[in-house]
Amino acid sequence: MLGGFFALMAAATFAWTNAVVRRGVVSGSVTQAITLSIPPGPPVFLAALLLSGNPGMIGELSHLSVLVFAGIGISHFCLGRYFNYSAINAIGNNLAGPVLQLNLLVSLSLAVFFLGEKLTPLRALGIILIVAGPTLIRRGKKSARAAPLAFTPRFAEGYAFAFLAALCYGASPVLVRFATEGKGIAASLSGGVIASAAATMVMLLLLLIPGHWRELRAVSPQNAKWFVFSGMLVYVSQIFAYMAVAIAPVTITAPIIGLANIFRLYFAKLLTPDHEMFGREVYLATVISFLGVVVITASADSLPLPDAVKAFLGWQWP
């Protein structure tokens, strides 16, 4: 399925983005990261819209869609990104990842209640597994790594920010699918232009605050490169995500995007091995969350099960 492929690409690029941000916030600040990573959005989305061959779609969106996409820009690109980067700064990618995957619960809940998508026993089991991952990390965090770390994790702060980021990120797929109004990929990319432009306007307004501008000017050239690159890459990730939810159900695409937790382990090992926690609990929690993703996307019809079991698994709610 093309939507599944787009979702998988979104997961990989999003995980790489978080690893790049982690590299930058080791010595830089979250404020510097979000201020420099947001402005690349409009040109990146606009280029994708032009390549889609239907740039005029941006003028065909309803007023409601425009407002929803603008709201997504502020909630996802500004607030969600701030919470996400703050969580990464406090506890690193590997500890923040399973908590951030709770965004899947938000997406599925909204998809069921507002988009009319269905919840099945398999999806319910997947949700339980996804929730179990962060719980395991929280209980085993003291023994998560035997070797000394180059940083001291701030667990309460990190988990709180990761949870808030999950709320913001979880609402986005449902809102994007709602705002595209069934008009396809070009509509989703048009919405991306609007969302990123709204987020950029907010960032420009924040620069009027003297302290914000002063902190931005203090960024080192090396960190500036990491933050700008992460901004460009995260919008590539968003392009894939927007296209995925435009052509496939949220209950399918959102879990696949959750595979970012698997990718982030390898990218973190590559870029910031001394600023992440690698241990049995971290890996086990990620595997459990991944199993939840697999279960959620599984189809009972494709499994060699007795008819009675298939009938039970075929139950839908609501």
Regions found by a protein language model. Name each.
Residues 33-34, 96, 188-192, 253:
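Juxtamembrane helix-start motifs in multi-pass secondary transporters
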Residues 15, 46, 74-78, 104-109, ...:
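Hydrophobic/small/kink-forming positions within alpha-helical transmembrane segments
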Residues 169-173, 177, 181, 238:
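Extracytoplasmic gate region of multi-pass secondary transporters
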Residues 1-31, 36-71, 81-91, 139-161, ...:
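Membrane-interface interhelical linkers
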Residues 10, 41, 100-103, 165, ...:
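Structural signature of transmembrane alpha-helices in multi-pass secondary transporters
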Residues 69-72, 117-131, 187-199:
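Alpha-helical transmembrane segments
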Residues 105-125, 132-135, 262-284:
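C-terminal transmembrane-helix exit sites in multi-pass transporters
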